[in-house]
């Protein structure tokens, strides 16, 4: 099964990716992991990517696409893969189609974990951190025993700037603007499958599993 996993920050994409790869035994291929492996192995494309990143520049599409092509050509992708973080643009999505065609593969589904914006805001702005112990809490999902106080050292919990509502809202808007053309592209192609992410983790995975079980032999 050849899959792409999509979802805005806070949608629970990482959790579901772990469950999918554990159940179906396909590699979880994230953009970051691909870049790190290519740079560590000092491949030609990896060294090119490193030169751009060291200069603080965006890695050009042709380098990224080449790294993706190399990764999807590896033996562990013979029975499928779960792509995460690629493609990010319609141009990359079109390049991925060419890559898969050259490898005699085809995409099965693009799974989009869909969560209402307000719930994403609640999830992402609820994190609190102890400035001394570094321990992390969540006001809804993992609250401290005493509100606003670290269980470990009694310090007053803080909200990081990255977790403040105005920052989170802007990040979600940027991500949604980037994701929408891809969602439209894959919807028109018939690959897109929206999964309701506004439910328990186990229930989200049940819905994904229901979709995928027809693909597994």
Curated annotation (Swiss-Prot):
Binding locations of AMP: 31, 36, 57-59, 85-88, 92, 160, 171
Phosphoprotein listed as a keyword: no
Region named LID: 126-163
Swiss-Prot/TrEMBL keywords: ATP-binding, Cytoplasm, Kinase, Nucleotide biosynthesis, Nucleotide-binding, Transferase
Record Pfam families: ADK, ADK_lid
UniProt xrefs under InterPro entries: Adenyl_kin_sub (IPR006259), Adenylat/UMP-CMP_kin (IPR000850), Adenylat_kinase_CS (IPR033690), Adenylate_kinase_lid-dom (IPR007862), P-loop_NTPase (IPR027417)
One Gene Ontology term, aspect cellular component: cytoplasm
Reaction(s) catalysed by this chain's protein: AMP + ATP = 2 ADP
Ligand binding (ATP): 10-15, 127, 136-137, 199
GO molecular function: adenylate kinase activity; ATP binding
Involved pathway(s): Purine metabolism; AMP biosynthesis via salvage pathway; AMP from ADP: step 1/1
Subcellular location: Cytoplasm
GO biological process terms, semicolon-separated: AMP salvage
Entry's EC annotation: 2.7.4.3
Span list, region NMP: 30-59
Protein purpose: Catalyzes the reversible transfer of the terminal phosphate group between ATP and AMP. Plays an important role in cellular energy homeostasis and in adenine nucleotide metabolism.
Oligomer status and interactors: Monomer.
The record's note on its domains: Consists of three domains, a large central CORE domain and two small peripheral domains, NMPbind and LID, which undergo movements during catalysis. The LID domain closes over the site of phosphoryl transfer upon ATP binding. Assembling and dissambling the active center during each catalytic cycle provides an effective means to prevent ATP hydrolysis.
Family: Belongs to the adenylate kinase family.
Name listed for the protein in its UniProt record: Adenylate kinase
Organism per entry: Halalkalibacterium halodurans (strain ATCC BAA-125 / DSM 18197 / FERM 7344 / JCM 9153 / C-125) (Bacillus halodurans)
Lineage: Bacteria, Bacillati, Bacillota, Bacilli, Bacillales
Name of the encoding gene: adk
